[in-house]
Amino acid sequence: MLELEESSKIIEKIKYNKPLIHHITNYVSVNDCANIVLALGGSPIMADDPKEVVEVVSKASALVINIGTLNDKRVQSMLLAGRKANELGIPVILDPVGVGASTFRKDTVNQLLKNIDFTVIRGNASEMQVLMNMNYSVAGVDSMDFGGNTPKMIRTLAQKYKTTVAITGATDSICDGTTLISVSNGHSLLSQVTGTGCMTTSLIATCLAVTDQALLAALAGVLIMDLAGEGAYASLKAHESIGTFKVRIFDHIHQLTEQTILEGGSLDVSYR
């Protein structure tokens, strides 16, 4: 499958280029996000003060904006860094963590979407449903309920925001508005580790840093986490559980090869 082959090639590009990935992210998973980028072969920097974000992002190959733990200062930094990244052609990925939890989060994401062009948006289905129903409207789409129809929602969302969207969950879906990819890899234990979604966003950003194909970068990032989850679970012994599982995720990503993706990836691709 072409998409699987092309996404697998990203692994070696990362190891060769060692791209700098700028994060403005939350303090819950920041250490894990830094380490996951390192495990894949990139170089993380977690700068979030308005006094330095423009300078830092100018040296980066991709920018992560994650709203997990918001405050006014961090929002200012997100806007400054995002605009500068757009100006320089640096890819930007949005992770709207818990966007439906508060008006502040929704207002912030609305502001970000109005002021920054995002290369990829990654979140879970409930977060994406909130984005779909926000007042920021393109082509008259204001409020829609897709009743669990993820393929329809993700296509509409990608078209609405003119971006590539990745919805992660039991089955992962990635769409650029035209091509829809469903990924059947992963393990249920991933949902019991705080920050695996944030780490997946960081993996996608690292992939974005070495390709201009956002759909393939999003696919590669999702597959890397899913296959690492499968491998980590398979390696557990009878007395080992969630803590060992988390550590093994990093081990498996560090040992990941192009062949791992080619042999392990399970995809379904449709076009429109």
Curated annotation (Swiss-Prot):
Q: Which reaction does it catalyse?
A: 5-(2-hydroxyethyl)-4-methylthiazole + ATP = 4-methyl-5-(2-phosphooxyethyl)-thiazole + ADP + H(+)
Q: Which UniProt keywords apply?
A: ATP-binding, Kinase, Magnesium, Metal-binding, Nucleotide-binding, Thiamine biosynthesis, Transferase
**Residues holding ATP:** 122, 168
Q: Which SUPFAM superfamilies match?
A: Ribokinase-like
- List all disulphide bridges recorded for this chain: none
Which biological process, per GO, is one annotated for this protein?
Answer: thiamine diphosphate biosynthetic process
Question: What EC number(s) would the UniProt record show?
Answer: 2.7.1.50
Keyword ATP-binding assigned: yes
Entry cofactors: Mg(2+)
Q: In which pathway does it act?
A: Cofactor biosynthesis; thiamine diphosphate biosynthesis; 4-methyl-5-(2-phosphoethyl)-thiazole from 5-(2-hydroxyethyl)-4-methylthiazole: step 1/1
Provide the top EC class: transferase
Q: Which GO terms describe its molecular function?
A: ATP binding; hydroxyethylthiazole kinase activity; magnesium ion binding
- Specify which residues bind substrate according to the UniProt entry for this protein: 46, 195
Q: Which domain of life is it from?
A: Bacteria
Q: Which family does it belong to?
A: Belongs to the Thz kinase family.
Function noted in UniProt: Catalyzes the phosphorylation of the hydroxyl group of 4-methyl-5-beta-hydroxyethylthiazole (THZ).
This protein's name = Hydroxyethylthiazole kinase
What is the organism field in this record? Alkaliphilus metalliredigens (strain QYMF)
